[in-house]
Amino acid sequence: MNEVVFDASAILALLQHERGEERLTVEIRKNAVVSAVNLAEVQSKLVKKGHDPEEAWVDALSTMIEVEPFTSDQARIAGDLIATTEKYGLSLGDRSCLALAIALGAPVYTTEQLWKNLKVGVPIHVIR
């Protein structure tokens, strides 16, 4: 299996044992990558829920997902995506995730229902 990209929401589903986590099988998880931007998003959401920042960072890393740096090419792709995703209200974090997937030619896993309407050139799997 080739690389797959996890959105922050997919990682949070794993960490918090939320509905849909069962769709992220071991086979899928062992090939997962995440943008550094989205890893920061995971940590931020955990801190907002009351976690200590250091513990939140360790928890985010505990998923054993490979972290990819946010490159200038991905930044350009994320900027370009505003034209086709603005009507869906996607954040910079969302577009960063999609930019990584586009750069890698990899499918994306997310919990965001709105994403199933996106046509960005890569498969999008909504896990719940």
Question: What do these predicted regions represent?
Answer:
Residues 3, 41, 98-128:
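Acidic, PIN/NYN-like endoribonuclease modules and their adjacent C-terminal/linker elements
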Residues 31, 66, 123-125:
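Conserved beta-strand segments of alpha/beta enzyme cores
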Residues 10-11, 38, 74, 96-97, ...:
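Alpha-helix capping/helix-boundary segments
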Residues 66-109:
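Active-site neighborhoods of divalent-metal-dependent phosphate/nucleic-acid chemistry enzymes
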Residues 49-53, 85-86, 125-128:
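Short, hinge-like loop/turn segments at secondary-structure boundaries
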Residues 41-42, 60:
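A general alpha-helix detector
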Residues 1-34, 46-59:
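Short, well-structured N-terminal submotif of metal-dependent ribonuclease cores
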Residues 62, 94, 116-118:
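Short secondary-structure capping/turn micro-motifs that flank functional sites
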